[in-house]
């Protein structure tokens, strides 16, 4: 039987996104008993067995690697069964978010998205990128869309290159958001010019989600 200390050491090398290693003691451990004895899971690994993936906290390369790996694993387990992506994120890196986005579109299973708490910036983009008819938000969650942020430094030629890149990303994100919401690109460009916060009902009316969930269906 594995000890709790050994389990925490194992988890520290593969911590769930949004949690630092020092906080692992706060992650619940689930013990399942069967005819073959006991087996311990951290709560996120146990929920992964139910095809639930969590994207919590900043969207960065580490978060993207974890989410992408889980999506690919669940596809290999069953390519015909939906995956649920739970989002509570202030956003973050565009490149990391696009890695998650492209994987969501690439794999065979539909990816259902659900906002709990906050889906802002890239978090909102990924929320809207779920399978059509399977994008949800809880009633008191908030959604925020805006244009990509960037800070250019260096020589004038370097700043010019970075400016062209962020303008390209802005246009590309607007096109994709228009595709997923049904809004025209011009409206998306206007509405993302500054931080644009929405209630879950407003997000539904805008086309970012399909339904506000009061209770589990």
Swiss-Prot record:
NCBIfam families: clpP (TIGR00493), PRK00277.1 (NF001368), PRK12553.1 (NF009205)
Protein name, per record: ATP-dependent Clp protease proteolytic subunit
Presence of the UniProt keyword Hydrolase in the record: yes
Superkingdom of source: Bacteria
Gene name for this UniProt entry: clpP
Reaction(s) the record says it catalyses: Hydrolysis of proteins to small peptides in the presence of ATP and magnesium. alpha-casein is the usual test substrate. In the absence of ATP, only oligopeptides shorter than five residues are hydrolyzed (such as succinyl-Leu-Tyr-|-NHMec, and Leu-Tyr-Leu-|-Tyr-Trp, in which cleavage of the -Tyr-|-Leu- and -Tyr-|-Trp bonds also occurs)
SUPFAM superfamilies on file: ClpP/crotonase
MF (Gene Ontology): ATP-dependent peptidase activity; ATPase binding; serine-type endopeptidase activity
Job description of the protein: Cleaves peptides in various proteins in a process that requires ATP hydrolysis. Has a chymotrypsin-like activity. Plays a major role in the degradation of misfolded proteins.
Family the UniProt entry places it in: Belongs to the peptidase S14 family.
Organism: Burkholderia lata (strain ATCC 17760 / DSM 23089 / LMG 22485 / NCIMB 9086 / R18194 / 383)
E.C. number: 3.4.21.92
Biological processes per GO annotation: protein quality control for misfolded or incompletely synthesized proteins
GO CC terms: cytoplasm; endopeptidase Clp complex
């Amino acid at each position: 039987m594995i000890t709790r200390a050994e389990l925490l050491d194992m988890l520290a090398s593969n911590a769930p996104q949004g949690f630092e290693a020092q906080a692992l003691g706060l992650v619940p451990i689930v013990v399942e008993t069967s005819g073959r004895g006991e087996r311990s899971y951290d709560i996120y690994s146990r929920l992964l067995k139910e095809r639930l993936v969590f994207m919590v906290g900043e969207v960065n390369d580490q978060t993207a690697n974890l989410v992408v790996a889980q999506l690919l694993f669940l596809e290999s387990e069953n390519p015909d069964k939906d995956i649920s992506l739970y989002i509570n994120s202030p956003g973050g890196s565009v490149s990391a978010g696009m890695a998650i986005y492209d994987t969501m579109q690439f794999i065979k299973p539909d990816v259902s998205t659900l906002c709990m708490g906050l889906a802002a910036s890239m978090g909102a983009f990924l929320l809207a990128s779920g399978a059509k008819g399977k994008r949800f938000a809880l009633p008191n969650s908030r959604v925020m869309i805006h244009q990509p942020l960037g800070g250019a430094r260096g020589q004038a030629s370097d700043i010019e290159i970075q400016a062209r890149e962020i303008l390209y990303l802005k246009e590309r994100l607007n096109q994709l958001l228009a595709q997923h919401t049904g809004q025209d690109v011009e409206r998306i460009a206007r509405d993302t010019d500054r931080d644009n916060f929405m209630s879950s009902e407003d997000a539904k009316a805008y086309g970012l989600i399909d339904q506000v969930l009061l209770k589990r269906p």
